[in-house]
Amino acid sequence: MKLTSYWLETAPSFTASPIAALPGSVDAVVVGGGFSGLSAALRLRQLGASVVLLERERVVGEASGRNGGHVNNGLAGSFSFACKNMGVDKATSLYRVFNAAVDTVETVVRDNAIDCDFERCGKLKVGNLQAHRAALLSDYEKLQKEADPDVKFIDGQQIRSELESDLFNSGLIYPQSARMHMGRFGVGLAQSVMKAGGLIFENTPMTGIKSGKGGFEVSTPHGRIFAKNVLMATGTSRHGPSWFRQRIMPVGSFIVATEPMDATTLEQVMPGGRNVVTMQNIHNYFRATADNRLIFGGRASFSRSRTTTDIASGHMLLAAMRRTLPALPDVKIEYCWGGDVDMTVDRLPRAGQWNGVYYTMGYSGHGTQMSVYMGQRMAEAMSGMSGTNPLAGRSWPKIPFYGLASHFLPVVGAYYRAKDYVQNLEP
């Protein structure tokens, strides 16, 4: 079992700009080489701005290259709850932003000829309790009326047409969702930035930032750059201004990839061929790959990714995979990895300005499509275009007890596992 991301291991190599070419001044510095930063850098070049992207390690080496491979539309939580919490108009508007984000990814793939197995496969959100069924039905009715007439509610034997499993009693199909190879997309996006004239420097962290007349002085180990504008797209990074770190809770998400299987086997286990997300408090998500592997992930451990946690999580995920898909043959796990999700208190992303510095982050597990979309929107804002940020004006509270919060994550995880156990005892 390789303790590395399948996406990163099987992505093509990428050659960044030589360190000697670090310029003295540019229109924009983008900090962070994930999908947000790369998308912003490409859009900035399209709008005529000179741009340097600084990445502490390797492009798409963190969350962008360590996720489950889904490009899903729909909110992270319940649409019905969002309507009650923020009002129907705001919830509907946000839902449509997520839809537009999936469209944006597809457009970027097409316009830049990125070979990444992009496919509109749809998402299936499944429940195994009567409470789940009621919640899915409520969301279905609300979505049909307000935001997405394409969603479809299924139950009973209809489930078996999607999954060969007796575990689930209901599901909601989101046809607009997609999937792709994250590593190949990320490298293709980075190559597109370079081809457009942008500069990318890997292993080049931002070590300081000072505001000055007409812009910002950004420090790196390889020199300083003056930029008219700076975009922070750093997600769960432990570095950079503390204002951002105090508002992000890094939560580990862990994933395994099986060895390749016979295509017929996967089709029998997952005849619907969709991205699948479960509704348990400790939920799982899974999908097939173009080379007939099963990618299966979840919050197996409520701690940050590291070697010991990744190994333990891999064994837990294998057990969960067998419970969830009992028809799956005794297949081996070839890859196991973890990554950190940049959670906000309400699981909604944030984008705007702080002390003149632009930012976009906090995608809370729904980052693939939103990071690409928001990278473009923030690039447009940095270029002087108005009304481009759909997340403008949203307050961003600190994580309560930020310094201690990570120590309580295992307790939170134990609570939700116990809650799942009790709920599963229902008749």
Indicate residue ranges for each PLM-predicted region.
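Extreme N-terminal leader/targeting segments of oxidoreductases
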Residues: 1-28, 46
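Helical element adjacent to the flavin cofactor pocket in flavoenzyme catalytic cores
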Residues: 138-142, 166-228
